[in-house]
């Protein structure tokens, strides 16, 4: 069945009526006319790729230079021992007890066992917070915190933060994880005049690090960010709040169950407030 003459389709370039313009037949177009936008897009993409590659090369080169000029960390263990001798009797026992180590890692640096000395995601958050003026959002790994305690305790500013990042990477390349935790536990300040895990365990709870219970270990791990403000002897409620936070992080990371966290928080903290020395059990 054919079309009526007025409605039958007409070839390209032929109008239905004299006042109507039809598009040209695509086959009659100059190939260069439709190819130009595509070529422009490719040129833009190539330029973007070149810029990104240049930035990547520059970043790698900058990283290498910074790593080269950052001081060696071979004396880190000696520095930790010096802090021990200056503030308390060094903890002579085995590696950092599991309860405290797990509590510290869960709340301060949950990627500790998988990261290369620096948490790039956290660093990005800190950089964004600094640029936007929203203050410190956290982000220092245990390596960087240890680097600060050993090498730049009074430093500040972006230059010091970069140095701490590079020192943290060097610490990771030089020492095993267990040694990093041990040095951290030996030099960290826990408030109330207690430097080191041994002094804090003895001073607050009258026990050694190996004798810490779950709520005690969680409390001490929660002190490292605000040792004076969260001192459980002077600010008991704040310390319990930090304990609850650490227990929650242990639940989130799968180290304990919610029931265990609830039972631990229900226990009363047996605070002693001693000198921080003389504990043997």
Language model feature labels by segment:
Residues 2-281:
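Juxtamembrane regions of bacterial inner-membrane/periplasmic proteins
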